[in-house]
Amino acid sequence: MGPPNAPPRRAFGWRPGQNARTWRPHREPSRGAGFDAAMTLRRAAAKAFTGGALLRAGVGVLALAYAPAARAQEGCARAPPLGAPAGAPADPLVGTGRVTFVNERLELALADGRLLRIAGLDPPRPTPGDPDLDVNSSVKLADWLVGEDVAFRLLETRPDRGGRLAAEAFAPVGDPASPARPLAQAALEAGLARFEPGEGARNCRAALLAAEAGARAAALGLWADPYYAVIAAGDHDGFAEKAGTSVIVEGRVIDVERSAYRTTLIFGPRRGWDFSVTILQRNTKIFGAAGVDLESFKGRMIRVRGLLDMRFGPQVEVSGPDEIEAITQAKDDAGPATAPRR
């Protein structure tokens, strides 16, 4: 139970002038200013990329990871120190706070008035099959956290336009006597959200993807809803009514096309009908800085996440390697790839 002043659970996520319950992802949204603004934000996020390394693991597995991996995962697994040595200035980015409520975006409202957005989480939306999916996820997280203290490490000094501060957050989960653990990882393990790539989640990327994969395999939380199933690149019906929403698509790249303006990963022979992934020219440099050769994706199975654009056939624009998982190293026994028809 939360403190006496906590709002009703059905009010999670409400802000003046906003009604989160009116949004329904199964209705195709306008492809106007809203969609363009979302794409602009994703492109801007690419500028924060600082580089990394392409690591091959085994004969049949390729993973995109960022060095130094061991150090990064240690940083992901530990809560930040909650104090400074005597005489040393306190770190303004590190702190602790009491959670008073959790909204439907899985953001944590603290007793001091701050609102934390947990880095690495893409919270669920209402779906045709479960209009309360977002509420149920927030209630579960609230059961863990409301009335409890969380440790956090802020990833930015100023809140965004929604008043949120991106942060890594840590707290005991389930048993208050248990050690504090990363809340993003715990939420993904329970299927309360999907992994969201970004600078703030980069150090924890491998651990967070593994947590998401476990929940997906066990059909926990949102993964029990068919709406959130990973879409096969060749399943055109799977893209229906999802334009402008965040999707995860998996398939084999049959060709890589380069032009003066973009590089396109092609998944099928019918241009304008089959799925494709677009990387704008300015973002190809980000892949190069990470040691990722886009041509190397040809013939490989990859998993891509991003906003779905249906204006010229199903496609997703990615801004950096964080948004792609390469899950095989080369072609399997399915036979040679088919070149696209022009």
Residue ranges with predicted function:
Residues 40-58:
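Bacterial N-terminal signal peptides that target proteins for export
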